[in-house]
Amino acid sequence: VKRTTVSKFGLLALFSASVVFAQADGGPDGVAMKESDPGIPVTDPLVQEKCGACHALDAKGNMSRISWVRTTPEGWAQVIKRMVRLNGLPITPEESRAVVKSLSASHGLAPQEALPVMYLAEKRTIDETNIPNETMRGACAVCHSFAQPLSWRRSKTEWKSLQDLHVAMYSQADAQYRRPAEDSEQPEGRDPKDKMLRGEYALGYMAKAAPLHTPEWAAWRSRQSVPRLAGEWLVVASAPGQGRFVGAFSVKPGKSADEFVTSSTLKSLTDGSTVSRSGAGIVYAGYSWRGSSKGAAAAGKPDDLASAARETMWFAPDQQSAQGRWYWGDYQEFGLDVKLIRATAAPAVLAVVPGPVKVGTKGAQFRIIGHNMSVSLSASDIDLGAGVTATKIVSARPEELVVTADVAANAPSGQRDVAIGGAVLEKAYPVYSKIDYIKVTPETAVSRLGGIKFPKGYAQFEAIGFENGMDGKQGTADDIAVGPVDVTWSTQEFLAVYYDDDAKYVGALSPAALFTPNVEGPNPERRFGRNNYGDVWVVATAKSEKDKFGKPLSARAYMVVTVPAYQKWDQPEVSQ
């Protein structure tokens, strides 16, 4: 028997051909898998041209597979990349961008569907709280975030096709799907010994949680229109470790109706420094902003606010406000959390400085930052919330009021709204009586070794003070976040392996809580010549706040310092 060597290219060609023939013959992707849901027609000639070779167009304008899925711009960009790699799709970058635009509008998500999973497009590293049980975690959130499938809407047939694709391409997925669904409800009348598998449960769950047709999408299809975002916007922003910012965001029309040119200026509420940025953005589906911008000066350090950044924002359907993240770094670990409000002739309150104020304080000074605020006010016209009385206006400008106020000794702890001349800022600042405990955020973090062949992945921490709520218990929902606390930072060994000395090798933590990881690769100074990876505690010790025993308050977060990301799943082209 003669052996034949098959190259990687040959395998790819064979696999691609099988997909095409299967669709043509009515195989797994063709007519044999009957759709019970009505499809969403594809009317764009470019999409029909680029996708029609494999995805048949029926008499109703539906294209196989495509007409039974909806997703975000990143999702469609991901699909096109996969079609190029696996099936050899011939498409130029310009055509690809046009197809992503088109499908994001005709087969995208409604604003209400996209908002809960915007953190995926915003590249946030968070602990997800939307995973219903361990079965779904094992089936869908072991290899990627749960927001990945929740960023899609599919027919039940398409969810099954996606599951089959995972089994074919990723052996680990097959193993996960075959495990019993231990903590999930089982079908009535089923033998208890014959437990539903994770794959079965996940298929049923996703078909119900993220179906193709939803009331939100039906309503948005008729409302979707050309975004009219040109004009001036007010910005409120914050960056972990760098404080709060206010400023302006100017939007001008670009080359097409959904493209814009931008400029912005942000002013620090901590030290008054300013950062100017310029860039451009694209709006998908009438509300979903993807852009890029950079500062006027070159970035001098990894967390520099002038760094070139990508922008992801969600604009409200009324196009009067937006929220999102402008992020940068090789692992998108740095970023500004931003909120935009359209600037109009009406007054607006944006921020209150310095922020937290203690119960019983007399003559506390507040800087109220805003827009078009009246300068003909008396102290009685300024409402600072329950138990806080404005006593004097020190200075008044349309963009800033400086007032003094007294806080009653019996004022209840909690957030206060500020109201001036019809403008209201909710939860503008907290009133507190004491700081009962502190918390390090994020509570879990990932940093990546680098600096030789691969970039470093940094981590930024903050220490936030809290007062116990009405129940007097720590860590419950009614606790009051007071704000950042002045602390001393350090790292401590996370005791997992004897003599590994992770805290010595993983990297360094600055006084401002910016963690810089060590270099990648074997370290001859370390036992067994291991890499500098490891896990440690990041510890914050308060400089002033103490517990009931007179000891400084302290808290810690868990951090894993791991190897570089040798493969990345990203779609930066949607911001270009």
Regions flagged by a language model, labelled:
Residues A56-L86, S145-S171, S276-S278, I282-V283:
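Gly/Gly-Pro-rich "capping" loops immediately C-terminal to redox-active cysteine motifs
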Residues I341-D381, R397, A423-T476, D570-S575:
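Beta-strand/beta-sandwich contexts
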Residues P215, R223, A308-A351, A555-A565:
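Edge beta-strand at a domain terminus
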Residues Q48-D58, V99, M136-Q148:
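The canonical Cys-X-X-Cys-His
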Residues A219-R223, P227-P317, Q323-W326:
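Central antiparallel beta-sheet cores of small beta-barrel/beta-sandwich binding domains
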Residues G360-G422, G483-V485, D502-V506, P511-E520:
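Immunoglobulin-like IPT/TIG beta-sandwich domains and homologous Ig-like subdomains
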Residues G88-V117, Q172, Y177-W220, Q224:
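C-terminal capping alpha-helices of c-type cytochrome domains
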Residues Q23-V47, N87-G88, E95, A110-E134, ...:
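Electrostatic cytochrome c docking/interface patches
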